[in-house]
Amino acid sequence: MKRILTLTVAALALGTPALAYDGTNCKAPGNCWEPKPDYPAKVEGSKYDPQHDPAELSKQGESLAVMDARNEWRVWNMKKTGKFEYDVKKIDGYDETKAPPAE
């Protein structure tokens, strides 16, 4: 009996903090983020604005385009030979400035 009472008290003690938060500041269930008091409503132009360089941002887009071009060559080679070749430099006729030949 003493053991059950101890376990019940422990469960209540551990579960009580979960009941303390009433969610009054949540915009929706689970959306409870609030900015700090000095955080601006508009980030652009404030001290929190990261001011990313457009050239740096375009690098990822360029690398994705080059990756897609290599994948086109891999797919073309797979259809042609039936064998997948990861290293595009080993594909006959590979030219990084051109698209693979039309079928």
From Swiss-Prot:
This protein's UniProt keywords: Disulfide bond, Methanol utilization, Oxidoreductase, Periplasm, Signal
E.C. number: 1.1.2.7
One BP annotation, GO: methanol oxidation
Single GO MF annotation: alcohol dehydrogenase (NAD+) activity
Major location category of this protein: periplasm
Primary enzyme class: oxidoreductase
Gene3D superfamilies named in the record: Methanol dehydrogenase, beta subunit
Catalysed reaction equations from the record: 2 Fe(III)-[cytochrome cL] + a primary alcohol = 2 Fe(II)-[cytochrome cL] + an aldehyde + 2 H(+)
Record function comment: Catalyzes the oxidation of primary alcohols including methanol.
Family statement drawn from the similarity comment of this UniProt entry: Belongs to the methanol dehydrogenase subunit 2 family.
Quaternary structure (record): Heterotetramer composed of 2 alpha and 2 beta subunits.
Name of the protein in question: Methanol dehydrogenase [cytochrome c] subunit 2
Organism: Paracoccus denitrificans
